[in-house]
Structures are given as C-alpha cells and as structure tokens.
Amino acid sequence: MRNPKAECQEKCAEEVVFEFKLEPQYGQGFYINENPLGLNALVIVKNESSSPVRLDITRYNRPTSNFIILAGDEFGVELDNIQTVGIFNRGHKVAKGKIIIIPNFSCINKC
C-alpha cells in the first residue's frame, strides 16, 4: 500500500524541464498556461553558459516579473498566476541551460 503523504508530494511536485540554447540577443518562450488565471509554481533557471540571461514571467492580473541570471548561476522564484515563462539571452555568446517548473510547490510541505 502506498503512503498517502508520498502520493500527495508526487502530485504537488510534478516538475517540467525545458532545455534552452539561445543565440546572442535572442529570446524564446518555453511555457504557456492555457488556464487564464495561471499557475502557482516554483520556477528555477540553471544558466550553464558564459552569457547572462533574463527570465521573463507574465502573470494574470499582476505585473510582469523579470530577473537577470548571471553566467553559470542558478535562480529560483515561486510566484502565483503564471501565464508564460521565457528566456532572453543578454550576452554576446550562445546561452544554454535549463528551466524547471514545479507546479504547486508550496503544497509540498502541507502534505
């Protein structure tokens, strides 16, 4: 028999991983939520390149959030009402890395 707490944590923490490789001064959207109210999630960016990138997150009825992730750095933020997630390469070299989205991350500790 499965542990109910483990099942709850699995449901809350189904992560989605996107890999990016962007030319200099180029951006791309990686996630679009079809629910108009958006998604509550933890968004993590792992910048595995020597170029800084900008994380852009649009949200329902909230201002757009922008964060700079320096070369070789990691950044995570938990927000509500997420509609889109994108990355823009601010550097002069190819930028590559990963975007990890963990829906309903805050519920993990409530299970």
Give, region by region, the residue ranges found by the protein language model.
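C-terminal interaction-tip segments
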Residues: 2-19, 23-26, 92-111
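Surface-exposed loop/edge segments in extracytoplasmic proteins
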Residues: 13-18, 52, 61-69
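Tight coil/turn sites that cap or link beta-strands
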Residues: 25-27, 70-74, 82
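Short, charged beta-strand/loop "edge" motif centered at a coil->beta-strand transition
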Residues: 28-32
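Asparagine-centered strand-capping/turn motif at beta-strand->loop junctions
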Residues: 33, 43-49, 87-91
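Extended extracellular/luminal ectodomain segments enriched in beta-structured repeat modules
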Residues: 36-40
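Short, surface-exposed beta-strand/strand-loop-strand elements in extracellular ectodomains
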Residues: 42-64
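Noncatalytic modules at the cell exterior or secretory-pathway interfaces
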Residues: 78-94
